[in-house]
């Protein structure tokens, strides 16, 4: 059975994650080329797909992190330990997704303004996305009384 506090934290995390990933996807879309269609009417559907995938990955990363932490008392105990692991899992997933879609599948490409992490050959923006959006979402979703 899931405690009310856990439900509350998960709802806030998923909601803030969806809003954060929505804003990020819209703002960093110009850093990509080749995946946005010529018709402006298709762009919202592609962005929605990205946001849905990002939100589901954020939930999966947090679930895996809570499990890896081995603490069934989350969010009351081990909140930030699980949060740090969730961010790490998200960054690893982002690196894999960027590599897969840019270099293997060719689903999208980076435009010239996208800064690249040299040793990983992936864009800086998606990596920052998977540090900042989950980090802020975890901060906002934390239970009352938990230290910042």
PLM segments and residue spans:
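Aromatic-rich, lipid-facing transmembrane alpha helices and their immediate juxtamembrane interface loops
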Residues: 1-148
